[in-house]
From Swiss-Prot:
Source organism of this protein record: Caenorhabditis elegans
Nucleus as UniProt keyword: yes
Motif mapping: DEAH box: 260-263
Record key words, sorted: Activator, ATP-binding, Chromatin regulator, Developmental protein, Helicase, Hydrolase, Nucleotide-binding, Nucleus, Repeat, Transcription, Transcription regulation
Domain SANT: 797-848, 899-963
Primary role: Energy-transducing component of a NURF-like (nucleosome-remodeling factor-like) complex, which would catalyze ATP-dependent nucleosome sliding and facilitate transcription of chromatin. Involved in vulval cell fates.
Acidic residues bias: start-end ranges: 31-41
Family that this chain belongs to: Belongs to the SNF2/RAD54 helicase family. ISWI subfamily.
Protein name: Chromatin-remodeling complex ATPase chain isw-1
Subunit: Part of a nucleosome-remodeling factor-like (NURF-like) complex containing nurf-1 and isw-1.
Amino acid sequence: MSVHESSNEINDEPMDTDSNIPESSGNDPSMEVDDEPESSDAADSFKRFERLLQKTENFSHCLSSGDAKLATGAPVDTKKRGRPSKKNGIDGDHRHRKTEQEEDEEMVADAIKSDDLVIFDKSPFYIENGEMRDYQVRGLNWLASLQHNKINGILADEMGLGKTLQTISMIGYMKHYKNKASPHLVIVPKSTLQNWANEFKKWCPSINAVVLIGDEAARNQVLRDVILPQKFDVCCTTYEMMLKVKTQLKKLNWRYIIIDEAHRIKNEKSKLSETVRELNSENRLLITGTPLQNNLHELWALLNFLLPDIFTSSDDFDSWFSNDAMSGNTDLVQRLHKVLQPFLLRRIKSDVEKSLLPKKEVKVYVGLSKMQREWYTKVLMKDIDIINGAGKVEKARLMNILMHLRKCVNHPYLFDGAEPGPPFTTDQHLVDNSGKMVVLDKLLMKFKEQGSRVLIFSQFSRMLDLLEDFCWWRHYEYCRLDGSTPHEDRSNAIEAYNAPDSKKFIFMLTTRAGGLGINLATADVVIIYDSDWNPQSDLQAMDRAHRIGQKKQVRVFRLITENTVDERIIEKAEAKLRLDNIVIQQGRMSEAQKTLGKGDMISMIRHGAEQVFAAKDSTISDDDIDTILEKAEVKTAELNEKMGKIDENNLRNMTFEDNAKFTVYQFEGENYKAKQADGMGHFWIEPPKRERKANYQVDLYYKEAMRAGNPTEKQSKAPRPKLPQVFDFQFYPRRLFELLDKEIYHYRKTIGYVAERPKDVPPKEAEKRQAEEQKLINNARPLTDKEQEEKAELLTQSVTDWTKREFQQFVRGNEKYGREDLESIAKEMERPLEEIQSYAKVFWERIEELQDSEKVLSQIEKGEARIQRKYAVKKALDAKIAKYKAPFQQLRISYGTNKGKTYTEEEDRFLVCETHRLGHDKENVFEELRQSVRMAPQFRFDWFLKSRTAMELQRRCNTLITLIEREMGEVVESKPVIVTAADKKKSVAKDLSKSSGTPTAKKVKATPK
């Protein structure tokens, strides 16, 4: 065994460091860069970026130039003996020429230094039952170099390259070479927990791994007898269990915290992300095969968990990696790639695993059965207004339509009531009523003859129910795993399928539950029954079989229903996957589209709708399976060729032709993107004609015959009065409503209308009111000519011609600014001040005439109360801040008994002073406060405060302001003068007492019966 230089060995895989970086003698890369406070000014963003690059380059330098020794067998005792050597000079200062004495002392220090980095050139002695592959040994060396330099990282090898084994070997290295056996914490998905325990026993039996799972009694026993006394090396648990026992786990100081499938913490605000950040640990390691699933912010969340002092601001990170900043800037792209190199190791199978044959994917296009076509049409017809662009487009409604269409193309029996019965039978109709099932049946027969074993993935657990019935009918032995499968049953099913000479032919799984961390390499065929929205999930599913240990070529068959939503989902996923290849494999970290927009969903729904409506019969092919697969391979090659021609910009815009002729907005030769602003545009799908049978329309015949045989003469009635469109907020003269009431009563008299009895009052009172109403009808008379002229004149005397929307603007203006600030209301409404003043005078005099006067008045008074409260808070804050010359350093808060343990006094002082500086009455003040907290240099390592939301900061500030008001002992009076509802009612009642006649109508428009 020959001695290797550590820098050459480590640089082989994970990073390309610059050999010209100045030499460093320390192992702490953070000492290489002055940790000067980061400015909160946006203008300093570039400087912060330069600092980040400098820090990461120094990390990379430490990884490549650290001291190393070759591992030649079992470790020796390397404890330091004697006194430690003294160091002269300033730590980290290597810019000046050394004196001879300094150089001698440094050489002596290097000679007696024992904490060397161990470099492996073959599988370590503590790994049993097999040998690690070369690239896995290099991965172990990379992990060891991270630990040696006190740096956390992400092991992001492609799925199936043995990330679990590399991690286990790293923990073995900690035990056998670093004498740091425990405790280590491994947090994994529930589906892979038992697999991790088995892998520890298989590869490194010297490590004592304990599994923490079970009910409360079982958990408490493990915690009491094993975890808290630290009688273990590694604790393996699940995400859910981690949240349940977080209090006990916080009591330990962990050597390593390792999170498998680390994209589970891509949302830094999730409960799991917050909890794992609160654990104490020396090192952290994230394991994921898909470090970038949707956008760069998720990658920042992972890096922030590993290195919160380096990756502090998500806003800065997002802006540096934005599309605009990176477009056409090759130098910036290369430097950004350098940022990630020290922390992220990413390798793909084609580069490192030559013995594993590449998987072959074929897209198999199928038709619709007659029943599928009928149900697909029903779903489209139910929401035809959405499809034709005439209805209200809501994202939740669109997603619901998409999900129903996906159920149609999978199997119509997913809808309740679709399956014929009772009695319900399991026979040929289960296959014939679904195009995918017809092809699946042919495929499975072929694979059974070939001796292959099959994995079937679907999004729908109820689809697995149908597949179970199908397997029972065809006498196929199978295993099943979905999100509701108990942990013990999962382990038993995987072991039964992977057992030597297993007779299990099919393993059916839901994509999300079975696509993570499960080794099913004994299967060589993967069937994607329906595709996931996220193409990474399908890749993870395929790699359950396409992984180390696979001896055959893995074939993947993706079932797609032609001219349906399936095709659009696949095209969207393909484009997203191509973009991911550009981003990850080339080191390009620009942001990809995260979620489906409304336009994408509408396009998916519309795709193929006319073909579905036009045809009536089944379009399932009768070809044999070999012919179907030949056509599928040709079509797959064509699609791959088309996608390969698309450049990155078109991928981001979801354009599927390099001449931009066809986009997701393209349908039947027209582009509806340009017509989106025109409402319906010219888009219209003609629904299928409804076919009616005339055999049962006897009732209609007799109805027409009776109408023809008994002609009735039309009664002469008074013409229906033409009532004007009047609104209560326009404040017409009261006399107008009296005349309108007379007109209505006379019309009711002419048609013989009988007054209805009120239902919401006691019987006697109801009878009395009915009699009074009927008396008014009986005594009614038509309007005289003079009254008609008077009515016409009164219709011209409205206070305003405002619409309902403008009136609501006026009410909101009073609520926002107060009834006295008419100038601000006028600016808000963009109306002349004189007009607002004139209307406001009438409004407050006659507000009781409004139909919902109490609601309007209450709304305004609540707004004025908020104004008064803001004024009181401002006055209290002004008085408190004025007591100190330097309030950010000197301000004291009298907590009394309300101190609490969540926020420190320094944090509270900053919140109060910064809120006062920004202005408590300012809109979005707490969002600005949140940004100030994140930019404040004194809180750069205060993860708790930096992770608070604007709402949480608002609640804390409200508590502090209450304490300050109590401390100041003042009752602050507000400037606005509030007129109460009671006072206004008295004023209106006084005006009404002067008028007489029929009570005025409050309805917007009187409608005679």
